[in-house]
Design a protein with these regions (language model features):
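Conserved beta-strand core positions
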Residues: 7, 44-45, 151, 198, ...
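Short, hinge-like loop/turn segments at secondary-structure boundaries
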Residues: 97-98, 119-122, 216-218, 252-254, ...
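Short glycine-enriched, charge-decorated loop/helix-capping segments at active-site entrances
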Residues: 51-52, 172, 212-215, 275-281, ...
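Terminal RNA-binding accessory module
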Residues: 348-450
Length: 450
């Protein structure tokens, strides 16, 4: 037990990767390591990488190179690289960055302690990769890094969808659900640590259970999680539109703790492009599904993501997207300019779109969404909502919080004017008094609802 050793963990990329980082922190904590946020005093640096799109790849490479320098200038004795980039570019990283001492794939992060022991014991260039389709064992509790009052619960790993632009199946393997009992136990541990909001994540949450139980079990999982004392909000992200069932809609509607919020990445609205993307929905099906959600759960907040400038996208296709966004009026929308990823079918399509056009189209969609978001925000004025307090605004009698419509890190906030003392994680009733494009302003209507 190297008790005196200090570890810095750098987590890049998505919330699913963050869960893996928190799992590794839990294992390292169990084995007696200390932690630091200061790269200058770290004895060991672990970088959990991302390479989903080119920008993420660059960030991962730059972070590795930056931290590699600390082996010369700082106290760093061991540099370990994990995650998606390690999975994809194992050979290149070992060949081109000699400072890297250990490397682990996406399905072996539970080996972090063993790899560290081997590295600290003098073994060079330790490499740990198992079958991509195994599920790491995570009986040890996680160390929460999100501030304590919300946590991501990763309910499945991998993906079987094989969209033509996406490398996730080759980085994360085939779809495999985490057994329900294990998830319930993990959620109970999180609640005991003070977590009040669970955010369910996976590459695709709506298929949960199909591989283990022979049918979709997300509704059943929601019912089980809703019974855990101390959990007040359950939020679902990464839903595939074609997998949303009547049972799921009913579970969202009937379980009080499940937020009336769904993140449903649709990626496009032109049938021609959806087909080229390998997506399994048509515009008509998307329209029907969104209409059904709005009818069944009138106050639902819908978030989606779209890709602008996919290979072969014409101006006509782009106009279809704009018309669809205008008609559907999503509460939340993120748009990415298409990024060609090597080894994906779409990267080999002949009709790639120039960078400038991709960015112009992305900006055009976002400008339209900004108008929609402002109208949506303004329509909230006068409503009274439960707000989870995130923290205090420095030097002001005000707090920052989130409503059920806001997932952390990706959506907006509500600024709550109050001289009273609230703690992060408190739920407060707030009357909305004003709005900007993506954020709301309000005042305390009735304190401490939960």
């Amino acid at each position: 037990r190297e008790i005196s050793m200090k570890i810095l963990c750098v987590s890049l990329g998505c919330d699913k990767n963050l869960v893996d980082t928190e799992m590794m922190l839990g294992l390292l904590n169990r084995d007696g390591y200390n932690f630091t946020d200061d790269e200058q005093e770290a004895d060991i640096i672990v970088i959990n990488t991302c390479c989903f799109i080119n920008d993420a790849k660059e960030e991962s490479v730059n972070t590795i190179l930056e931290m590699a320098e600390l082996k010369k200038t700082g106290t760093c004795k061991a540099l370990i690289v994990t995650g998606c980039m390690a999975q994809r570019y194992q050979q290149e990283i070992l060949e081109e960055i000699p400072e890297v001492d250990g490397i682990l794939g996406t399905s072996t992060y539970d080996e972090i302690s063993n790899v560290l022991k081997r590295v600290l014991g003098g073994e060079e260039r330790v490499s740990c990769f198992h079958d991509l389709n195994c599920l790491p064992q995570t009986e040890t509790g996680r160390m929460i890094t999100t501030g304590g009052h919300f946590a991501f619960l990763k309910i499945a790993e991998g993906c079987d969808k094989h969209c033509t632009y996406c490398i996730i199946p080759s980085l994360r393997g085939s779809y495999r659900s985490v057994p329900m009992e294990r998830l319930v136990k993990e959620a109970e541990q999180l609640a005991e640590q003070g977590v009040r909001e669970l955010i369910l994540v996976a590459q695709e949450t709506t298929l949960y259970g199909v591989d283990l139980y022979g049918k979709k079990m997300l509704p059943e999982l929601l019912h089980r999680l809703a019974q855990i004392p101390g959990i007040y909000w359950i939020r679902i992200q990464y839903c595939y539109p074609e997998e949303i069932t009547d049972e799921l809609i009913e579970a969202i509607r009937s379980e009080e703790k499940v937020c009336h919020y769904l993140d449903i990445p649709i990626q496009h609205a032109s049938d021609r492009i959806l087909k080229r993307m390998g997506r399994r929905t048509s515009q008509a099906q998307l329209r029907e599904m969104i209409g059904r959600l709005r009818r069944e759960i009138p106050d639902i907040a819908l978030r989606t993501t779209m890709i602008a400038g996919f290979p072969g996208e014409t101006e006509e296709d782009h106009q279809e997207v704009l018309a669809f966004v205008d008609e559907m009026e999503f509460e939340r929308l993120g748009v990415f300019a298409y990024s060609a990823e090597e080894d994906t079918p779409a990267a080999g399509f002949a009709d790639q779109i120039p960078e400038e056009i991709k960015e112009d189209r992305r900006d055009e969609i976002m400008e339209l969404q900004q108008e929609i978001a402002f109208e949506k925000s303004e329509s909230m004025v006068g409503r009274v909502l439960d707000v989870m307090i995130e923290g205090k605004v420095a030097d002001e009698a005000a707090y920052v919080g989130r409503t059920y419509m806001d997932a952390p890190n990706v959506d907006g906030y509500i600024f709550v004017n109050s001289g009273e003392l609230f703690m992060s994680g408190d739920f407060v009733r707030v009357k909305v008094t004003g709005a900007s494009e993506y954020d709301l302003i309000g005042e305390v209507y009735d304190e401490f609802t939960k």
